């Protein structure tokens, strides 16, 4: 994979950088600027080299139309604060305003182009249409840096097609992500433990299939665990269940046994009379995993399982975690996710290499107040890190080879 140093001397050069600024907003207030901060090392390095830094990114799903509430204006403002520099926002992605703002740049300046997904061609399935659009963006720059790890699993105009038109390389963030995820999956120090949670088994099928012969231990919680418990013959009450995945999951349980992979499931769960929303009161109770009442819904792993999961994680040299253990947004059902996060922090302190997969696990770690430096690596890509763990070829990385 080509990296920044492969681009040579960038002084005075116009460098297009595809970043991942898809941040959560409350109105125009950014509620988590983690993704913006993750892009700073690449931006600062390029500025120090005297490049003209032209940033592009998407925000939300405007579906190819201009949606004012999804403008990157709040991102430009926050970037300016973090860099201590003015970051003008172009009114378009490649039109007159973008061209004028780029033409006015001095060495070391930073400009942000407006939301690439305001253009229908950005996510078009028609390769020719995307390529023609990418050429218009590429005309603004003299080199391309791919630094939005959150989008490398998609072939889109601003991260895939642009790479065909300009000398292209991975930015520092993408390089760091690929190194960390490769280290965990290609040659992990053992014991290698994979912790999976989140609501659906179907989202994690590929990861389980790819890692069933690589991991020493699979630890499973979250909503997806009830399909595992049901596959073992337990009743799961009104808990989330994917009936159509039962046969697959039975197969995984058999394969794990055959491969000598330790499969760790909760021994107790925290249940409630239903999902804690609207009129449903929060009245948690702890029951054995094989004795969930017919009218109750499992929403977290129980205290015994929290200790079990924590100890299994600490007894590891490599840990990859993707997906929360319960409905962590509700304090009564957050203890399982906290226990797993604490397990990773304790394992890291003891010398293990730990990765928090992007998406919900990363936001859980932040929302629950864990320090980012307590983990070896917190991924910025939800879908991208999952597909990497599935062993898939990611189009946005392939074009940087």
Curated annotation (Swiss-Prot):
CDD domains: Phosphoglycerate_kinase. SUPFAM superfamilies: Phosphoglycerate kinase. Gene3D superfamilies: Phosphoglycerate kinase, N-terminal domain. GO terms for biological process: gluconeogenesis; glycolytic process. Transmembrane segments: none annotated. It is found in: Cytoplasm. Pfam families: PGK. One of its GO terms (cellular component) is cytosol. GO terms for molecular function: ADP binding; ATP binding; phosphoglycerate kinase activity. Belongs to the phosphoglycerate kinase family. Monomer. This is Phosphoglycerate kinase. The lineage of its organism: Bacteria, Bacillati, Actinomycetota, Actinomycetes, Bifidobacteriales. The gene is pgk.
């Amino acid at each position: 994979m080509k990296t920044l140093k492969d681009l040579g001397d960038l002084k005075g050069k116009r460098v297009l950088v595809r970043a991942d600024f898809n941040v959560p907003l409350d109105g125009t207030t950014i509620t988590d600027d983690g993704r913006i901060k993750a892009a700073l090392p690449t931006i600062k390095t390029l500025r120090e080299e005297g490049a003209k830094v032209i940033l592009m990114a998407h925000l939300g799903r405007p579906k190819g139309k201009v949606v004012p509430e999804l403008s990157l204006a709040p991102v430009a403002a926050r970037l300016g604060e973090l860099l201590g520099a003015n970051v003008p926002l172009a009114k378009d992605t490649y039109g007159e305003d973008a061209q004028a703002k780029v033409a006015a740049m001095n060495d070391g300046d930073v400009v942000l182009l407006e939301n690439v997904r305001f253009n229908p061609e950005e996510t078009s399935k028609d390769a020719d249409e995307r390529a023609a659009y990418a050429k218009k963006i590429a005309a603004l720059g003299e080199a391309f840096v791919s630094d939005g790890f959150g989008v490398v699993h998609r072939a889109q105009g601003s991260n895939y097609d642009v790479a065909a038109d300009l000398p292209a390389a991975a930015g520092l963030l993408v390089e760091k992500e690929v190194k960390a995820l490769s280290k965990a999956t290609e040659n992990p120090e053992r014991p290698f433990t994979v912790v999976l949670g989140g609501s659906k088994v179907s989202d994690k099928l590929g990861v389980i299939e790819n890692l069933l012969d690589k991991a020493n231990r699979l630890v499973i919680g979250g909503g997806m665990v009830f399909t595992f418990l049901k596959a073992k013959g337990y009743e799961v009450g009104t808990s989330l269940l994917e009936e159509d995945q039962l046969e697959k999951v039975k197969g995984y349980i058999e394969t794990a046994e055959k491969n000598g992979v330790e499969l760790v499931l909760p021994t107790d769960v925290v249940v409630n009379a239903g999902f804690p929303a609207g009129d449903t009161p929060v009245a948690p109770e702890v029951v054995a995993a094989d004795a969930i009442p017919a009218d109750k819904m499992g929403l977290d792993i129980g205290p015994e399982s929290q200790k079990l999961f924590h100890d299994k994680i600490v007894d590891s040299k490599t840990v990859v975690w993707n997906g929360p253990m319960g409905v962590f947004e509700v304090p009564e059902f957050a203890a399982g996710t906290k226990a797993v996060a604490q397990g990773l922090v304790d394992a890291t302190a003891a010398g293990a290499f730990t990765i928090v997969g992007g998406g919900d696990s990363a936001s859980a770690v932040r929302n629950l107040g864990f320090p980012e430096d307590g983990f070896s690596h917190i991924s910025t890509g939800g879908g991208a890190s999952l597909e990497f763990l599935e062993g898939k070829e990611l189009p946005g990385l392939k074009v940087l080879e």
